[in-house]
Amino acid sequence: MGKLYSIRNMATGLAVLSLNAGSSVASDNQLKLSGEKPNVVIILADDMGYGDVSLNNPFARTSTPAIDKLANEGICFTDAHSGGAVCTPSRYSLLTGRYFFRVPKKTSYWGYLAPLIEPERETIGTLMQKSGYTTACIGKWHLGLNWGRKDMSKPQIENAKVLGYTNTDFSSSVTGGPNELGFDYSFILPASLDMPPYTFLRNGKVIDPNIVLTAEAYRHALDRTVYAWDRKHTNDNDVYWDRGVWWRNGEMSKSFKVENCLDEIVEEGISYIEREGKNKKPFLLYLPLTGPHTPWMPNSQFSGTTELGTYGDFIAQVDNVVSRVTVKLKELGIDKNTIVIFSSDNGAPWATEDILQYGHQSNWGRRGQKGDAWDGGHHIPLIVKWPAKIKQGATYRETVGLVDIFATLADMTGQQLRTNQAEDSFSFMNVLNGDLQNPTRDHIIYLSSAGKLAIKKGPWKYIDCIGSGGFTYPSELLSVKNGPTGQLYNLADDSLESNNLFLSKRGIANDLSELLKEFVNCGYSKNLTK
């Protein structure tokens, strides 16, 4: 344990907090449980890179005035990370406070997969319910559901690619979703907007059970030039209109419109805020968006309004969502005591060819893209605003993760977490309290789309493979004789992860590898460094 101990103390004093002039938190403004409990709104963008927020990227070709305003009125975390480099792992971590690699069985049937969160597992929904909150999940779910079957003697899905009709009974109740996991109200899309089934569910019931195939509802456009990233995800059965404007063939409610999906989610969210904002009971709204994930289909208000094509237009629409939510909170007079958290589930799927074509770096300052173990896969924007308690314009550089939201909400509501609850979540309430001396965590673990793990501790980052571990080619390389078997980077000097120090700093690499194994095998990480 001697080596592990030395690694754990390697990061002492490295966390830095920089505050804009006049933005320090006053000592008499400590967060307390006395008084009215705050409402909580969590807006989770889908596939939005750190550099897509114009405030974060000095050369951004996107414009996000509402998100920038949110950051200027709250705290902006510049080293925030998702629990995984793709959708489902990240959402699991946010809702449960656990890393996704702890899930024993993982399937990939798109929106048809079985529930990944056990019924007895605590979520931020159940956590806040215990503190007297009304809770809602409105938006993209992507954590599995129990669908009914037309013929119980047959499997639900014959083909894992789900290109046509399935054995799903869309008229029956659906369980295993938000309503069974701590959310009083739900309005959800089962998975990503490019994955079947394309349908909305309200409180476990499909709103429109009249099912067609996307091929019947939308024309194909297969003669376009398909970019390399898209080519990996498309085939002759899918709808393909342009770079990023594609979705898989499959079952779809007859009334469902891909181009209207985000608007419908936002309307539901705004209606919920209006309804619950008039009540005395505090509310938690988890609002996971479908944009700017593919298909990049902004509505007519934003189509063609930016220099960045359909992707930039979709970013503008996502920014407008933030504007609409914050404006509604102010209209209702509840903005002062409402915590608004904005983030993204992973980095953007923005390949080298996109950077060359558009001159924009969605994952600004980091190597790689969505799916990768490199920082571009999981480095995300994270902004927290709470006017009643937080002074404006703070920038916090210490490492935090979406997985930490669970413990932070528990801290905020005065709840003591059990040992087997939110096993990987660290509260960053100290930051909101203005405590600049004690870091939230001294390590964080990442999971790539290919199941590769990485750990960051202090300036050092170790990846347990050679290659991106994700969408960027090559995902994984075979090691050669006397060559590295993993990757080690000093992020303090090499934020682009270009100089692999695995061989020259083998001792550090080995220690981090062992520490990673310890965290994985013991079943938790939140108490090992305390």
Model-derived features: positions:
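Formylglycine-dependent sulfatase
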Residues: 3-6, 18, 23-487, 495-530
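Sec-dependent N-terminal signal peptides
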Residues: 10-18
